[in-house]
Amino acid sequence: MMNKKRRKKKRVCQFCADKNAKIDYKSTQRLQKYITERGKILPRRISGTCAKHQRELTVAIKRARNIALLPYTLD
């Protein structure tokens, strides 16, 4: 048997691809995509964002949680 190496297609960061997309703590619909059903922030390898935008997302999600736009946990 031959072991075939699988090559995954490199995911492009959604925010790098769309220059008009801004990461804002007030846009809760966009931030909801990067939170699990338990309320945790998705890691880069799952969300597909670059390091720069992942940091910005984390800050925006934490700000939104702080002013009660997003919940800390989801039940």
Swiss-Prot record:
PROSITE patterns according to UniProt: RIBOSOMAL_S18
A GO term from the CC aspect: cytosolic small ribosomal subunit
GO biological process, one term: translation
GO molecular function: small ribosomal subunit rRNA binding; structural constituent of ribosome
Pfam families in alphabetical order: Ribosomal_S18
Record keyword Ubl conjugation present: no
Entry keyword Coiled coil: no
InterPro entries, A to Z: Ribosomal_bS18, Ribosomal_bS18_CS, Ribosomal_bS18_sf
Keywords, comma-separated and alphabetical: Ribonucleoprotein, Ribosomal protein, RNA-binding, rRNA-binding
The family this protein is said to belong to: Belongs to the bacterial ribosomal protein bS18 family.
Function: Binds as a heterodimer with protein bS6 to the central domain of the 16S rRNA, where it helps stabilize the platform of the 30S subunit.
Subunit structure comment from the entry: Part of the 30S ribosomal subunit. Forms a tight heterodimer with protein bS6.
Protein name from the UniProt record: Small ribosomal subunit protein bS18
Organism of derivation: Clostridioides difficile (strain 630) (Peptoclostridium difficile)
Upper classification of the organism: Bacteria, Bacillati, Bacillota, Clostridia, Peptostreptococcales
Gene behind the chain: rpsR
